[in-house]
Amino acid sequence: MSNSASSFTGVSSGYTAGTPVPADSPIRDNIADAVRRVRETTPLAQSFTNFVTINLVANAQLAAGGTAAMSFLPDDVIETAKIAGANYINVGTLLPFYKDALPEIAQRLNYLDKPWVLDPVAAGIGRTRTAILQAFKAAPPTMIRANASEVIALANMWGLNTETVGDASEHRPAGVESVDDVESATGAAVALAQYLTEQHAKHSSHDASTRCAVAVSGIADLVTDGETVYRLPGGSAMMTKIIGAGCSLGGVAATYLAVSDPLTAALSASLLYNRAGEVADTTSHGPGSFQVAFLDALWNVTAEQVAESEILVQ
């Protein structure tokens, strides 16, 4: 399965909830620094991503300034992880042997202290995918990037979401599409971010004060480290008309994770996508030209433009 981006970022639709982050906030400095560092150092972010969107994922990572490596064999993933700055696992398209291989890869990444991003595409659909995602609870990622329904489904799957009303099955994605709005996933996103942080603090040799992050894509994206919830209005509705916008965002988030902390990486990737989508909107004439213009915008948008984007604290 593949994220078609119908739940990805879109026009702000007048979304105004939240307090604006000041122009002189250190958060904005961190974002600008992350964008610059990626372009200056071209970090390697390895991706185990789905077959449908692999081309856009790789091209987006390159356009953002990083280096891409696309791996599918478990031994390739482990060997490449040793030299990669960060890694990305997307469960959109799976083969039966991945049921055992992917949890082992996750355990190995954490043993090596290698940060990684999880995109739980279509969480809650299919026994193989469900078994893999359940196993990730014992070897959790550093960051999660997903749509609202996937975030809710994963939190329910891990027994973390106490705010969902009704049967958890009601919140399963319709295929890869979200049937929930971003706002309804706030509690699940916070719970997941807190769990990731707690687990990595126990087992990682990295700074225990570094918090993990969850990014929820939607009309006004949500990013949280489990303590603070940020909303990021903006982007383009045309994102809903190209396959792989959400998947490629996960790959770019991994690129930023190679040079920055999880919260900064999640904010930087989402804001870059919002700004690039807005730029592409002004020159494109349909889905085909939009995708080309979008990749060009990922390349051309400046660090200052990304850092100056609208950021609200919810």
Curated annotation (Swiss-Prot):
The keyword ATP-binding belongs to this UniProt entry's keyword annotation: yes
Name of a matching Pfam family: HK
Signal peptide: none
Major enzyme class: transferase
Cofactor: Mg(2+)
UniProt superkingdom: Bacteria
Pathway listed: Cofactor biosynthesis; thiamine diphosphate biosynthesis; 4-methyl-5-(2-phosphoethyl)-thiazole from 5-(2-hydroxyethyl)-4-methylthiazole: step 1/1
EC number: 2.7.1.50
Keyword entries, A-Z: ATP-binding, Kinase, Magnesium, Metal-binding, Nucleotide-binding, Thiamine biosynthesis, Transferase
GO MF term set: ATP binding; hydroxyethylthiazole kinase activity; magnesium ion binding
GO biological process: thiamine biosynthetic process; thiamine diphosphate biosynthetic process
The keyword Metal-binding is annotated on this UniProt entry: yes
Chain residues that bind substrate: 70, 244
Binding site for ATP: 145, 217
Function in brief: Catalyzes the phosphorylation of the hydroxyl group of 4-methyl-5-beta-hydroxyethylthiazole (THZ).
UniProt family annotation: Belongs to the Thz kinase family.
Protein name, per record: Hydroxyethylthiazole kinase
Taxonomic source organism: Bifidobacterium longum (strain NCC 2705)
Taxonomic lineage from the root: Bacteria, Bacillati, Actinomycetota, Actinomycetes, Bifidobacteriales
